[in-house]
Amino acid sequence: GDIFYPGYCPDVKPVNDFDLSAFAGAWHEIAKLPLENENQGKCTIAEYKYDGKKASVYNSFVSNGVKEYMEGDLEIAPDAKYTKQGKYVMTFKFGQRVVNLVPWVLATDYKNYAINYNCDYHPDKKAHSIHAWILSKSKVLEGNTKEVVDNVLKTFSHLIDASKFISNDFSEAACQYSTTYSLTGPDRH
């Protein structure tokens, strides 16, 4: 489940001059902080498409031999359109229920890695929960890219406890599936 910290969300600055065109493509979820209600699937991939006007997202993972996926819309967050900061909104429809997720890109080189972050304040608990994802254009972080990501995580250690990351599995066995299932669409809830 979520990891809670006392008080409000900390003040965080996403990357400046965010380039959605360069960010587009398939990203492998190398690791993530535990997140309540998120899949525990393997072989998790987020694919961002952008044609210069409209953007979309296709998230997929494999669980028990089934490739489950969600399709949604993607746009730069309203407060980031003019500041050019790396904040975007993903909108998924599960039947009548609409879910908006707002990841912030803390760091990326657009070609090899990205570190996404999100914080939610929970007034009932007077606490916030932090979510973070390490993304890569390849199935593993190696060499210089791994070193860069480790160093970036050190600079954000006041926000993200890297020891809490859960690694994803991109082995051939974990990624095998025999059927697909859409989590989004008019008949899903």
From Swiss-Prot:
Pfam families: Lipocalin (PF00061)
Keywords: Bile pigment, Chromophore, Disulfide bond, Pigment, Secreted
Subcellular location(s) per record: Secreted
InterPro entries xrefs: Calycin, Invtbrt_color, Lipocalin_ApoD, Lipocalin_CS, Lipocln_cytosolic_FA-bd_dom
Free-text tissue specificity from the UniProt record: Synthesized only in the caterpillars, apparently by the epidermis and secreted into the hemolymph. The protein is passed over from the larval hemolymph to that of pupae and adults and is sequestered in the eggs.
Disulfide pattern: C9-C119, C43-C175
One annotated Gene Ontology cellular component of this protein: extracellular region
SUPFAM superfamilies: Lipocalins
GO molecular function, one term: pigment binding
Record's keyword annotation contains Secreted: yes
A Gene Ontology biological process term: response to reactive oxygen species
Predominant place of localization: secreted
Domain of life: Eukaryota
Domain remarks: The molecule consist primarily of eight antiparallel beta-pleated strands, which enclose a hydrophobic pocket, and an alpha-helix.
Family according to the record: Belongs to the calycin superfamily. Lipocalin family.
Subunit structure: Homotetramer.
Role: This protein binds a chromophore: biliverdin IX, isomer gamma. Mixed with lipoprotein-bound carotenes, this blue protein provides hornworms with their green cryptic coloration which serves a camouflage.
Protein name: Insecticyanin-A
Organism the protein comes from: Manduca sexta (Tobacco hawkmoth)
Lineage: Eukaryota, Metazoa, Ecdysozoa, Arthropoda, Hexapoda
